[in-house]
């Protein structure tokens, strides 16, 4: 019986490369000369530090550009609100990995409401979709791709 898995994974090596590229761009930009600003990658999060709030916004834009150049979907970014420590502003960016329970239930409901002849099962942080026909599975993939659920999904282990 044909099946596939829906997962949400991020290549953290590419995130680290994007962080390095954004740091390099930060050091060469004229509007950041003489300003204490930096990107730090640690424990699957990126911490941005700057002297003003508008600089953090510019840095976030730079980081999003670097991520898209490295082919990492920016919808996986979870940007936390900034906090001020003295004259330094900090902002943390976390990344959504795995499909959380509420999102998984939304995907199951989406597929069931479309009346596609497939069965979906939640298996931890991924979903297994099984059906009799390959066309039904491809229709389920198209439904999930069209839905805007706030994070990127990959489709793996497509088996006939």
Curated annotation (Swiss-Prot):
Matching SUPFAM superfamilies, A to Z?
Answer: YajQ-like
| Keyword Transcription tagged | no
Q: Which Pfam families match?
A: DUF520
Per its UniProt record, what Gene3D superfamilies does this chain match? 3.30.70.860, YajQ-like, domain 2 (3.30.70.990)
Alphabetized GO MF terms: nucleotide binding
Q: Which keywords accompany this UniProt record?
A: Nucleotide-binding
A single GO CC term for this protein reads: cytosol
Q: Does the keyword Nucleotide-binding apply?
A: yes
Biological role stated in the UniProt entry: Nucleotide-binding protein.
Extract the NCBIfam families matched here.
PRK05412.1
Q: Which family does it belong to?
A: Belongs to the YajQ family.
Name used for this protein in its record: Nucleotide-binding protein MADE_1020535
Which organism is the protein's source? Alteromonas mediterranea (strain DSM 17117 / CIP 110805 / LMG 28347 / Deep ecotype)
